[in-house]
């Protein structure tokens, strides 16, 4: 009986200490008291046991915890040796990885990883707030664009974006939502951009792509944040009005997000441009999977820059650099379109060999040479939180709307399938995903709207919202059965 009581005391004490997140010294005291209680014989009224060698061994946990309660001793005996061992096993952090880790800002994610989040900080983030102009754009041009879209025509009959859609998007400034009003753009908040993109995504994933890409990671945002005054005054108004259609070329045959393996190379040298000798870069590159590439008039290019003669004064290996190149510049080749899973948005390769460009075509000019990866990571910290999460959330909400309605009207054995447990379970998952995605989208967009660049949260949002959408689509197709796989203008799941 005494053994059972002692075990209950041990379990109760450990649970209490764990739930209270007690410090190490408290655990040492508890273990010491329990050991003393167990050896004293007080639980069963017997006399204390003799001090044999086994009784001394019982005090070892108390001694170990007591020693580990001293921070300096714990660090020298355990933390430092373990850290040194782990450091020899893990691969070294590359320069590009370090820049990615340092990019952006730390917000509520720090609270989450602290283990004791202050939920008041989360509640202090303001709710969805749109200006009158943003709300009017959402209710006006955005609604008109959605009404114009015939998704079956886009993805099946034409297999490309109709020109009237392109004209409407350009005319109404959809391509310049993030460009400031000072430079001819709409200057909308991230929250407004998220809602606008989500509404378009509910009608067509192809159409939202041509709006989303210029308003996420692309020349527009890079020029707005890092461009020279000349680049801002020349390109931003043209991008905002749709006179220039941009693409950004990062992915190649050997590299995607891993810029360290990039084989697109540029060498600083003097050359001739428009009959004049000037300092510039001779480029050779090969890119693929570039969205808007076949339609682009302005190519943003990421490459690794070398300066053998140190003409820029930054050493031989300058680093990842970003440049703006007109698509009709001599030597620039735009390849045939890819067909990514039957999608109709323009996507394709581009390449060039020994293409000379002036040094001032580098985004930000000569001084920003070698800073390209940091520039990309800073922009991605915000862009990842808006574009894909908004379209993924809209997709899930669309799945919920049509699937819940279908499950209510579709009957089997005299009952709506929505009342069958095998359908209820995936339907509940879709409902949960819709609420979770929308809450996360709205909260993250609000963070970005107030000036944060949450790199960790945005990366998690990009992955989690799209993955949850994929699962919701699977559940929706399972519930619809054969109706989901028979394509046609009435198949709302594939639109």
Can you say where each PLM-predicted feature lies in the sequence?
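Amphipathic, small/basic residue-rich leader segments at the start of a protein or domain
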Residues: 10-14, 32-34, 44-46, 50, ...
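Extended amphipathic alpha-helical segments enriched in small hydrophobics
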Residues: 384-451
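Membrane-helix interface "capping/anchor" motifs
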Residues: 15-29
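Alpha-helix capping/hinge segments and adjacent helical runs
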Residues: 109, 456-495
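A short core secondary-structure module
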Residues: 276-332
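Flexible, small-/acidic-enriched active-site or ligand-binding loops
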Residues: 330-356
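Feature marks short, highly hydrophobic, charge-poor N-terminal signal-anchor/signal peptide-like helices
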Residues: 1-8, 53-54
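A glycine-rich, basic-preceded beta-loop-alpha segment at the flavin cofactor/substrate interface
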Residues: 349-384, 401-418
């Amino acid at each position: 009986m005494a053994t059972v009581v002692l075990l209950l005391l041990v379990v109760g004490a450990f649970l209490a200490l764990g739930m209270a997140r007690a410090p190490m010294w408290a655990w040492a005291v508890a273990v010491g008291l329990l050991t003393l209680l167990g050896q004293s014989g007080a639980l069963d009224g017997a006399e204390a046991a003799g001090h044999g060698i086994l009784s001394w061994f019982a005090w070892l946990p108390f001694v170990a915890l007591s020693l580990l309660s001293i921070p300096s001793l714990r660090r020298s005996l355990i933390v430092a040796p373990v850290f040194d061992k782990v450091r020899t096993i893990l691969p070294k952090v590359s320069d590009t990885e370090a820049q990615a880790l340092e990019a952006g800002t730390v917000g509520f994610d720090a609270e989450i990883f602290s283990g004791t989040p202050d939920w008041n900080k989360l509640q202090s983030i303001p709710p969805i707030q749109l200006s009158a102009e943003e709300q009017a754009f959402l209710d006006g041009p955005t609604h008109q664009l959605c009404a114009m879209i015939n998704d079956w025509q886009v993805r099946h009959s034409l297999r490309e974006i109709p020109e009237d859609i392109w004209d409407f998007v350009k005319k109404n400034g959809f391509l310049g939502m993030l460009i400031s009003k000072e430079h001819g753009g709409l200057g909308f908040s991230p929250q407004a951009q998220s809602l606008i993109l989500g509404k378009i995504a509910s009608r067509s994933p192809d159409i939202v792509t041509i709006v989303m890409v210029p308003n996420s990671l692309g020349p527009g945002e890079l020029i707005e944040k890092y461009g020279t005054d000349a680049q801002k005054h020349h390109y931003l108004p043209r991008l905002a009005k749709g006179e220039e259609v941009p693409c950004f070329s990062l992915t190649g045959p050997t590299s995607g997000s891993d810029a360290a393996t990039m084989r697109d190379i540029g060498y600083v040298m003097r050359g001739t441009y428009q009959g004049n000798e000037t300092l510039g870069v001779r480029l050779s590159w090969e890119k693929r999977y570039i969205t808007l590439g076949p339609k682009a008039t302005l190519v943003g290019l990421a490459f690794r820059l070398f300066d053998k003669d140190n003409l820029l004064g930054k050493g031989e290996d300058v680093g990842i650099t970003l440049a703006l190149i007109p698509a009709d510049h001599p030597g620039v080749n735009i390849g045939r379109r890819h067909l990514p899973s039957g999608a109709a948005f323009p996507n394709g390769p581009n390449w060039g060999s020994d293409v000379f460009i002036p040094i001032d075509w580098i985004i930000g000019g000569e001084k920003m040479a070698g800073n390209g990866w940091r520039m990309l990571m800073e922009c991605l910290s915000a862009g990842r939180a808006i574009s894909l999460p908004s379209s993924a959330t809209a997709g899930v909400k669309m799945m919920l709307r049509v699937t819940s309605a279908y499950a209510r009207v579709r009957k089997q054995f005299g009952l709506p399938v929505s009342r069958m447990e095998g359908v209820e379970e995936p339907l509940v998952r879709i409902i949960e995903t819709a609420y979770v995605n929308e809450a996360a989208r709205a909260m993250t967009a609000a963070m970005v709207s107030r000036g944060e660049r949450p790199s960790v949260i945005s990366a998690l949002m990009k992955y989690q919202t799209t993955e949850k959408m994929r699962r919701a689509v699977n559940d929706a197709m399972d519930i619809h059965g054969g109706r989901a796989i028979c394509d046609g203008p009435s198949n709302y799941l594939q639109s």
